[in-house]
Amino acid sequence: MKKFNFFSVLLSAALLSGVTASTTVTAADQFVTIGTGGVTGVYYPTGGSICRLVNKDRASHGVRCTVESTGGSVYNINTIRAGELDLGVAQSDWQYHAYNGTSKFADAGAFTDLRAVFSVHPEPFTVVARADSGITNLEDLQGKRVNIGNPGSGQRGTMEVLMEALGWDKSTFALAS
């Protein structure tokens, strides 16, 4: 099976599974927007590649795909729920929390209409530091400059869960960006 056909099947499955808002427009008038992440990350080019493949054969299926740079996983899920995005790339842990109404999604409740269409890649949580930083464990991050991720991103959400578990907040670090 060609890659294009594979992604067409994925997009069709998403459209048929209720991920998009229902409309009464004709096939020639269907538009799909994929929420991704920052333009320098992995999610944005992934969404762009999917849209290029979908748009390549747009004349036969009548769907036009566009990609939107966003804040990332948590933002994408919230925006899909609000009906402002059709599809979005999200870390699986944040999809799990949204579906079950836990963590950052507790106030909004379970989002049981949310569906996974495909997986891009595994996303382990990794902390790295320069060899000369003196950092050998998580406790050593206190008082250091730490990238905690962009607001709305899965990285930021995961870091906030970790900070809460450790009893930390942004003031724990010399600089939290």
Spans of model-derived segments:
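C-terminal segment of classical bacterial N-terminal signal peptides
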Residues: 15-25
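Pocket-flanking alpha-helical
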Residues: 51-53, 66-108, 135
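A structural signal for short loop-to-beta-strand junctions that line the ligand-binding cleft
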Residues: 107-120
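Bilobed "Venus flytrap"/periplasmic-binding protein-like clamshell domains
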Residues: 31-56, 123-177
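Bacterial N-terminal signal peptides that target proteins for export
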Residues: 1-11
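Surface-exposed patches in mature extracellular/periplasmic domains of secreted proteins
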Residues: 61-68, 175
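Conserved functional loop/turn residues at catalytic and ligand-binding sites
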Residues: 5, 14, 84, 145
